[in-house]
């Protein structure tokens, strides 16, 4: 009976993951199938003022003495006999008139209004600039995912090169919650050096644009570029940064990330390591997460897969500690620890039934590193350490003070794994430009202007011939990374005044990408592709 109950839970969770993926694919296809010659109409929602008292319908108030009813204006209106009614018992009603769902909607609206006050400004290098989205010059697409696209842009007023994440606004409450959560966290985390920095936002009727610092690539793509493990010294510095970022989120903002994985860990040529993508982060109530968000099954903690009461999720930041442990094993060994899985169900079953993965003893890892990973992957979450305990671990203490030249290592890896620029070159004569009246996936290609030329390794979809108006069209290319802003510098800065740009497939792209470029998880080739957010 217990085994049957577990299978039912896993089946329900797998079904939820697939449903989320189908919805994500539907949204992407909807955006990409819109005719470019027909710009998306802007829908402006206005709240009408409350009707005057004279226009309001009379509110029937039950009388406690005789069971009848009268309207508020009954004293001044002609009296009419009313049919007899049976006496009514007055019931004590709760003082609030709002359901939890309506209160949640109100909270979303309030948060949006708060963020709207900050839109239209970029703060770069301590200087605040008033700006519009048209003040940004598009240098090319850097990547795309289930929640939008990421563009490399140049701020014309200063020449700064930044990353801009573009997400479409919709009537879907869950999508809007994800956008607002991402915005809320990055805007408030400006004082944490281990979280990707936000320069500002632009919000239109159709889109949300988040201007962020340009990072090099993510740990997931680095692993693919190297085609093997990442050195322990680099992972030591990475661990220090991510644990401190997660600790900051919990202590400063009461937030749990819920999507810790290699594709959400960013690095750059300066040696910086930062955490990104807070779309499915959750608020902690009494240090517990009270809401369920599927996230990526491959990195999900056992207590999230099989909670004591599935209707009342009740887990804490130690779920992210497990995800960090799985990520470290994957990056340190060069392969995902749960091997030969074909479905989410198989992964989830292995997480619950098998012993936690450990770092192999024959690969030369230090005892401190092995001990740290073992602590993170303690199956009983009640015995798994929290951040304050992890920060006292000898592995963290060692790499807090040890000097490691992450910048040189990063540059060396990026240089040695750069792809041939003559391989698989596709020509495309136009790049989309930003306008406050269009949305991602629906750019008016016929109206686009010539763009600067360069080599851009595409991690999203190259426009297909039926949607392009010039050049040789394109084809779907392999896609890596989830919806998180993997702000990847994919080649030299484009040179101005040339007529076209070449898109060349990236060597670190996922080999399991579907024909439409949707990201797949590494070892789980699902029939419906991966869970949104999985890579």
UniProtKB/Swiss-Prot annotation:
| Distribution of this protein across tissues and organs | Expressed at high levels in brain, lung, liver, skeletal muscle, kidney, and testis and at lower levels in the heart and spleen.
Instruction: Look up the EC number in the record and give it.
Output: 2.7.12.2
The entry's comment on post-translational modification says: Activated by phosphorylation on Ser-287 and Thr-291 by MAP kinase kinase kinases (MAP3Ks).
Q: Which cofactor does it need?
A: Mg(2+)
Q: Which domain of life is it from?
A: Eukaryota
Q: Where is the active site?
A: 259
In the record, which positions carry Phosphothreonine? Answer: 291
Q: Where is this region: Disordered?
A: 63-93
State where it is primarily located.
nucleus
Reaction it catalyzes: L-seryl-[protein] + ATP = O-phospho-L-seryl-[protein] + ADP + H(+); L-threonyl-[protein] + ATP = O-phospho-L-threonyl-[protein] + ADP + H(+); L-tyrosyl-[protein] + ATP = O-phospho-L-tyrosyl-[protein] + ADP + H(+)
Under PROSITE patterns, the record lists: PROTEIN_KINASE_DOM (PS50011), PROTEIN_KINASE_ST (PS00108)
UniProt keyword Acetylation present: yes
InterPro entries in alphabetical order? Dual_spec_MAPK_kinase, Kinase-like_dom_sf, Prot_kinase_dom, Ser/Thr_kinase_AS
Keywords for the protein's UniProt record, in alphabetical order: Acetylation, Apoptosis, ATP-binding, Coiled coil, Cytoplasm, Kinase, Magnesium, Metal-binding, Nucleotide-binding, Nucleus, Phosphoprotein, Serine/threonine-protein kinase, Stress response, Transferase, Tyrosine-protein kinase
Q: Where is this site: Cleavage?
A: 60-61, 92-93
Region: DVD domain; residue ranges are 393-416
The free-text function statement in the UniProt record for this protein reads: Dual specificity protein kinase which acts as an essential component of the MAP kinase signal transduction pathway. Essential component of the stress-activated protein kinase/c-Jun N-terminal kinase (SAP/JNK) signaling pathway. With MAP2K4/MKK4, is the one of the only known kinase to directly activate the stress-activated protein kinase/c-Jun N-terminal kinases MAPK8/JNK1, MAPK9/JNK2 and MAPK10/JNK3. MAP2K4/MKK4 and MAP2K7/MKK7 both activate the JNKs by phosphorylation, but they differ in their preference for the phosphorylation site in the Thr-Pro-Tyr motif.
What is known about its subunit structure? Interacts with RASSF7, the interaction promotes phosphorylation. Interacts with VRK2. Interacts (via its D domain) with its substrates MAPK8/JNK1, MAPK9/JNK2 and MAPK10/JNK3. Interacts (via its DVD domain) with MAP3Ks activators like MAP3K5/ASK1 and MAP3K1/MEKK1. Interacts with SH3RF1, MAPK8IP1/JIP1, MAPK8IP2/JIP2 and MAPK8IP3/JIP3 scaffold proteins. Found in a complex with SH3RF1, RAC1, MAP3K11/MLK3, MAPK8IP1/JIP1 and MAPK8/JNK1. Found in a complex with SH3RF1, RAC2, MAP3K7/TAK1, MAPK8IP1/JIP1, MAPK8/JNK1 and MAPK9/JNK2.
Q: What is this protein called?
A: Dual specificity mitogen-activated protein kinase kinase 7
Q: What is the organism lineage in this UniProt record?
A: Eukaryota, Metazoa, Chordata, Craniata, Vertebrata
Instruction: Name the gene that codes for it.
Output: Map2k7
